[in-house]
UniProtKB/Swiss-Prot annotation:
Heterooligomer composed of large and small subunits. The gene is xseB. The lineage of its organism: Bacteria, Bacillati, Bacillota, Clostridia, Eubacteriales. Its EC number is 3.1.11.6. The keyword Electron transport does not apply. Keywords: Cytoplasm, Exonuclease, Hydrolase, Nuclease. This is Exodeoxyribonuclease 7 small subunit. It holds the Pfam family Exonuc_VII_S. It comes from Clostridium botulinum (strain Loch Maree / Type A3). Bidirectionally degrades single-stranded DNA into large acid-insoluble oligonucleotides, which are then degraded further into small acid-soluble oligonucleotides. One of its GO terms (molecular function) is exodeoxyribonuclease VII activity. It comes from the Bacteria.
Length: 71
């Protein structure tokens, strides 16, 4: 079966957990490196979601301006 798409909020929560675990300094260097790698991947996914949302909003705003001008 296909993978269920993770929500923005769930990814952000995972990232916050990773940051907190790295901040407390109680994990090994190896675990820190794994967490860092996972955190970077999550950051990239979150950035993409935000950029996609920004693009959709821009399209909606542009369409709204066109509708207003044609009224």
């Amino acid at each position: 079966m296909g993978r269920k798409k993770e929500s923005f909020e769930n990814m952000l929560e995972k990232l916050e957990t990773i940051v907190n675990s790295m901040d407390n300094g109680e994990i090994t260097l190896e675990d820190s490196m794994k967490s860092y790698e996972e955190g970077i991947k999550l950051c990239n996914k979150l950035y993409k979601v935000l950029k996609d949302a920004e693009g959709k909003i821009k399209i909606l705003e542009d369409n709204k301006e066109e509708d207003f001008e044609n009224s």
